[in-house]
């Protein structure tokens, strides 16, 4: 009798553990909640245009200084706050004339809208009141969006925009 009771508790415990919530995948509605900073532009080095390569270098330089041109905050209440400094980039040549000087923009445009995220598709209303739907890939703390689809000023020639969760 004691043995049957022990087996019953072990089986019951295993069932409870196996029925617990699984690890959240990148397509669940909660996977996108949080603040995401644009940290990189991933391009095909073999076929990339000069504009894509230039964008990649700029994002790399700014990210190394903890300066993020675009931040997206997805709230639990389905509001989306976008902070975008890409319109305020001032690119120059450094004092030695040997490379670029890209100071972190101090000015940002901030917009608030609503969004939905389901099965890897992000849908939101843009500043022109148009509904935009994008395919989004989320893997842990990394979110990837097509640069052409998101259409961030100066970074929309091609490639994939890489966002990192704060």
Task: Tell me the role of every PLM-derived stretch.
Residues 20-166:
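Lipid interaction determinants
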């Amino acid at each position: 009798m004691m043995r049957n009771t022990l087996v019953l508790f072990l089986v019951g415990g295993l069932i409870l553990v196996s029925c617990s919530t699984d690890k959240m995948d990148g397509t669940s509605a909660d996977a996108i909640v949080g603040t995401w900073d644009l940290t990189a532009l991933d391009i095909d080095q073999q076929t990339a245009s000069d504009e894509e390569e230039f964008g990649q270098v700029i994002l790399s330089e700014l990210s190394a200084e903890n300066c993020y041109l675009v931040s997206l905050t997805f709230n639990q209440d389905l509001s989306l706050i976008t902070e975008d400094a890409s319109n305020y980039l001032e690119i120059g040549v450094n004092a030695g004339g040997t490379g670029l000087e890209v100071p972190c923009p101090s000015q940002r445009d901030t917009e608030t809208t609503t969004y939905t995220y389901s099965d890897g598709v992000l849908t939101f209303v843009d500043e022109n009141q148009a509904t935009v739907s994008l395919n989004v890939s989320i893997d842990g703390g990394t979110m990837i969006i097509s640069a052409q689809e998101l259409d961030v000023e100066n970074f929309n020639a091609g490639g994939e925009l890489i966002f990192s969760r704060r």
